[in-house]
């Protein structure tokens, strides 16, 4: 988590199925498209619909992206909650997932 990040990081959307649930397979497709274009990713931010995701979904989105990238490109995840305490708590969880 302390490495220097270079290059383009695309703020990707979070994918959902027809029922409104997070769709990890479609998310992996999004990630692969960006990797193939030579980009790293920023997941779970404004384009990633962070404001409609619960904590489990935020972790699932980040886990899916980190897993799919598998060290081939940088991945940065949004971390922002209503309270500072919750932001710090979630940030610690997200940091353990392998984001850059």
Predicted regions and their residues:
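Active-site beta->alpha loop and helix N-cap motifs at the rims of alpha/beta catalytic domains
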Residues: 2-100
């Amino acid at each position: 988590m302390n490495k220097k990040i270079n290059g383009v990081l695309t703020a990707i959307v979070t994918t959902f199925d027809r029922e409104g649930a997070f769709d990890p397979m479609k998310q992996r497709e999004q990630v692969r498209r960006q990797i193939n274009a030579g980009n790293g990713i920023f997941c779970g931010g404004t384009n990633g619909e962070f404001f409609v995701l619960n904590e489990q979904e935020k972790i699932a989105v980040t886990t899916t992206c980190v897993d799919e990238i598998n060290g081939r490109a940088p991945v940065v995840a949004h971390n922002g909650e209503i309270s500072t305490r919750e932001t710090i708590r979630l940030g610690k969880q997200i940091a353990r997932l392998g984001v850059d």
